Amino acid sequence: MCGSQPGENGSLREGRGPGMPGPYRVAMKKGEDDLQSYLEQAFGKSDVTSVKMRAAVREWFDLYYGVPRAGEDTAPRVAALIVGKLCRTVFAEYETRLPPEAPDPLRRSLSALNAAAKTAMQYALVGGECLLKPVPRDGAFDFAAIRRDCYVPLARDAHGSLLAVGTMERHSVDGRQYALLERRTAGADGLTIETRLFELNGQTLGRCVPLATLPACAELVPQLVLPGVQGVGLAVLKTPLMNCVDGSTDAVSIYAPAAGLLHALARCEEQLNAEFANGASRVFASEDLLRPDAQGRRALQDDLFVGLPDDPANVGVTVYSPALREGSYLARKQDLLRGCESLLGLRRGILSEVETPAEPRTATEIAATSVDYDLTIRDLQSAWTDTVQQAMALCSALGAVYGLDGLPQTAAPAIDWGDGVLYDRARIWAEQRELVDAGLLRPELALAWYFDLPHETEAELGEIRRRFMGDAGRAQ
């Protein structure tokens, strides 16, 4: 079935690693243009993303992958630093739990989703949106993350949800190039998947060939309807930011508000490099000291400075070491980094220096930046929680269509994010125990809070007493 084909997330990066500068950007941009053109020719549908938004998506990936740009030094890779730090913090204490009676296929599907979590989150932080495709495997589901520049939105509703999406896979067999194009369309009767296979003719789409032409596509059908599957059959992870590019409902990169500052940082780094290059010590010599070499080029002799007197000026040689002005450039760099932290809701010191003697900060300022950072992380964790719910619902719906057992409709894992940036779990647990000791709180409720257990009914409270309270619980 078409819904069981993995690998489409890598189709536009064939033969190139994700960190390749220069040629990677050219190849990826060309791949984006090919994808849009091919889908329009095959299905008569074009990308609904605005031109301004498409340019912004390319810019975000340029910033992340450090694509060279005139007048900028991309070596610091601040965008990659932002994404890496946020992703690590979001999943630092991430844990999912299923009820003890949950079937094995459900557990394996959730484990596969967790394995793709960090990749999907980083794709979403860079491109604003990432799709997770459920792929049937051994009676359960695996998940393939598809980043923003590897699919084309063909239709969206008023809230920005995908109503149709196109993807492409490239295949090479016996020296011939093929493009497998897929369009997913949401409908009232379920999900419709249309698949076309084309033999590429140079840079053009070429002719449509039967799907059985390639062994990898032999089991596909030109059109497939999956009843009961909502949306486009893909879980969606979006960044929780308002669109600051064109005002549309498209999701934006986590560092989209600071894109201008990131370019300014790259220019500042280039200027700082030039400052150090210009600050190298130089020797100025009189022209009459130059001698032609074997190629006729005039240069100083190797033994010129043998026996140089105490005063070099007497022999026409001057040593010059210009003073460096790196202080002003470094101060400007720190100012730009602090601006990025403020725009993106990062704690002070994540990107910039924690504190400089010239700019002491008050406890209120420190607390304010910590609160902003905590809210940023919570927003991202909430976005992933919603994606997990979507993915588990898709597994249940697709499992019913494919005839897979062990994927109940009510599969909803409990997610524990740990203490968070500001949350002090130990302090609250100590307060709970004080309330229990004072007789103001039932110990079952305190244990239910600590272990995140259901506690709405007497039966659930009785189960807590049985598991944790021993003889004291049975006495009650």
Task: Indicate residue ranges for each PLM-predicted region.
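Extended, helix-rich architectural segments
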Residues: 2-162, 475-476
